[in-house]
Structure formats: structure tokens, C-alpha cells
């Protein structure tokens, strides 16, 4: 099986003189299941549709968008694996100089607001062909939303792009149903009821019964309290089994967002990952693609995440229901990968959004179908959560046993609070899959901040460190924790960052990289950033907005770097904590210092 066509010549080699669906994407074409557009294109091909891909077209004219001709059914547009504004700009709104999804890691292969620009060019080229938008950019901007880069509330992307339909969440079910219905002759503009899609109703059209109406665009754009109310309402409608359709008026137009698509069953997910991917970039891409190099030896075991972290949009995109592949499916993919010429024995990752959620499910099916919690872990783990861990541990053992596999890493991150209830997975992980360094993401240690983040607190982290230390010592392994920490999150003050810096110093930990909070579309944290409110409690939240405060917060986590000493002293003066300067900036603490960039040493917690 060959790559899907990117030119008319390649389509003709398949005997296709006309395509049914043409995808346009802001990423390079990598025929691998970790890349969304190729996955959906292969899925449609499997179901009998003729599909092509136009990767990273030059948007300065409409000609590159005509490379595969006029599709019979519709165009499908995605900005790529990332929101195009997130891909282009740093948290300080400075232009990035690289792009991991582009050959040669070059910046500039896609435009800002790629979904809008691509749709505009397609309408210029083929005005009468429907355009469907999807992917992370469209999904998380489907309602009126705060845009950090313009510092204002923008309309639904469906209206701004002037597209015909928006797919939100994982797209296999909605795009297949749409394609089948259009193929049978149903008028595109009459289709407004597919789960996992949003449409703009015709002027005067009545929304379906049972909808939840969000505050209109004009109100959320002008009133932060109405914005917070809209976020609170839509957050309750993420469970596909009990969600209502949502409507939001934009002037005289009405956005109708249908409930999320139902999760794929295990057999369906297995069939997706059994599709004939080449597991390589299209030959037209002559230079290495960093994102592919990073994931080419990885295996996705499941989708979804029920952690519900405030700054993460997975719940609003993939959903909180864990959709796990069968062990047989995962092993078959590892075997195919191990047979490839480039494979050298190392599987770089076996996981998903959160590695140790594989096989975890709700033990109360009836209650789970009516549940409106965004997080199954915060403020405390749900009593119905069937966490097990044995299935995940057994899968790791089986992957290690595949012929040709010498090393297996788990690099997609873990929830250490969940792993307290997964002894089998914990033992398997520490014994065979750490490789000396284990990445975890406590993000902060001050309770007020971790509560707003919906993360476990310091006590949970301390328990995990002690457990990790004991198990590593028992195994005779020198292994370290790499904690990922965040500055500038809503609710976090300079005083909170001083406490976090002191914790790091006393623990003998030094970090070299800090994630500065970026308000990305669709998250609870972004709602708090824009409104200065907790939308669920209604309480005011401190928001670090100015460049100075953000710079000083970040500097406190890098207290050990000589280049940050002046910023650290400025931060201590700004919050009246000069008294801790000697402890923070003086000699080593924590009994022997810290290993730069490596995290905690077992035995020195």
C-alpha cells in the first residue's frame, strides 16, 4: 500500500480521476497514526472513500489548494496537531523560530490562524464545495473564546472561518457519518444533527429541543461574569452520554454545537490502528521532521484523560473516557515496527495522554453515563474508578517480550496520585521503564495554586517520591525524578513562587526549564486568566499579567542560575520576603545539593 496522494499524478496512479474528500493540513504529511489528518484520511479510505492530502500549502494564492482538483463531497481543513497561534508564538508573544511539524524544523510553513486562511483560499478556488474544519484549533475555538494573542474574545471559529461545518473532538465517527450521508445524496446544508459537529443555523431556524443556551457572543465579549458563566455551562456538557446540545447566538446567527461523539469501542480503535500506515513522511518531504523523529518508535495505547487539569484541554477534545486498545492490537503494531529497517530495538513510548490510565474505566456504568465531573481524580479520586493497573503492567511485560525489542520507555507522563492505587503498574514501571529518569508534572506545591490547577498537592508528591526512592533502592537502581513546574498560572503569586523555590532548595532540586503559563483556547485556566474569576466558585483569582511579574515568577524557579540572581532579589523585595534571601541564594541545602536537570536523587528527599 502506498502513501495517500498529494498530487493529481499520484491520484491517477491509483486509478482515481476524482477524489471524494481532500484534506488540507498545516502539518507535513507523515503517514503515522500519531498524526490526526493522515489517521482520518486512512480511516475514510478504509471505508471506501477516495481521499487525498494537501500538506502545508502556500496560502499566498489559491493555486496550491487546487493541487488535487475539486473533491466530489467536501474539503476537510485542519491547522495541524497544534493551534497555529500556539505553534507560532511563545508565552511572551514572541515569534518562534522553529516548527517541529515542518521539514527542516523551519518556521513559516503555515499562516497564523491557519484554519481561517485555508478555508478562505478554498472558498476562493471552489466557492460551491463545502468546507469542514476540525482538529485542535477548530475544536477548542468552537464557541466564543478568549484569544490571548489579540487579548480579546473572538467569535466561534466556525463563523470567523465561514466554513460549512465544524468537527470537534476525535473525528472518526462524525466525519465518517458525514461522508456517508453526503455520498448518498443528502444535501450538505441540511445536515445539522451529527454528534461531534457544530453548524451555524440558518437565519430564523429554530434549534432542536432540549438545548442549553450559552450567553451570547456580545455578552461574553463585554462581561467577564457572563464569560465565566458560559464556560461553566459548557463544561458540564462534555460527557457524551448525558450532554445536551449547546447553542450560542452571535448577532443574528446561532451556533449549534451537538453533543460529543460517543467513544470508540475497543474493536473500533483496534481497527483504526491496524490501517496500512507507512509510518514515514511522504517522500516529497526531503528534510527530517522533528515531530516524526520523536514519535516514530512510539505506540499509542489509549485515548482520553480523566485528570481534568485546569490548563489542559484534553477533556474538551479527547474526552475523559479512556478508550483502550486491546493488548493484541498494541503488540501487532510493535511487531510491525520492529520489522522496519530503521528500528534499533528501542520503543520510545508506550502510552497516551497519561500512560498509567490504560485500561482504567468507570466501575459504575449507569452512574458514569450521568456523571458531570470533569475530573475523576480531583479533588479526590472517584470511588467508582476501576484503576487496577494490572492490565497496564501486563501490557508492558508483553511489549518487552516482542522479538527485536530491547528497551521500552514510558515517556508520555504519569499521574502519580493515580499510581498510588496501581501497585503492579508502579513496580513494573520502576523496575523496567524509567531508564534512570522519570518525568512527572506536579506543576506546583502550594495548595491554593494546585487546587486551582486541579492537581494533587505536595503531600501526594512527597508520598510518591518516598515510594519511588524505596523501590529504586530495593532494586539497586540509581533513578531520578524530573518534575515539571509552571510559573504564572492564575492564582499564583510571587509569595507562592518563593515557597516553591524554597521547597526546591531544601529538597536539593534544580530545574533548568520552566513552563510559563500560556492561556490557550478552551481551558479552565484560560477562563480564569481572562476573567480573574473561578467560574465554578465565583471567587476572584489573582492573575499574573504583567511581563515583570511573569519574569520574576519564572526566575524564582531558576534561583540557582547566576544570571537570575538579580531577578530573584527583585522578586523577594517585591513580596517582602528579603528574609529568605540568605537561605535561597546562599550555600547548598538539602544535604548535598541537586543534580542539575535530573531531579530528585533517591535517598535525598
From Swiss-Prot:
Stretches with biased composition (Gly residues): 587-597
Entry's Gene Ontology molecular function annotations: 4 iron, 4 sulfur cluster binding; catalytic activity; iron ion binding
Start and end residues of each stretch annotated as Disordered: 586-605
Any Pfam family hit: Radical_SAM_N
Binding residue positions for [4Fe-4S] cluster: 305, 309, 312
Co-factor: note: Binds 1 [4Fe-4S] cluster. The cluster is coordinated with 3 cysteines and an exchangeable S-adenosyl-L-methionine.
Keywords recorded for this protein, A-Z: 4Fe-4S, Iron, Iron-sulfur, Metal-binding, S-adenosyl-L-methionine
The protein's required cofactors: [4Fe-4S] cluster
Limits of the Radical SAM core domain: 291-561
Source organism superkingdom: Bacteria
Protein family per UniProt: Belongs to the UPF0313 family.
Protein name (database record): UPF0313 protein GSU2873
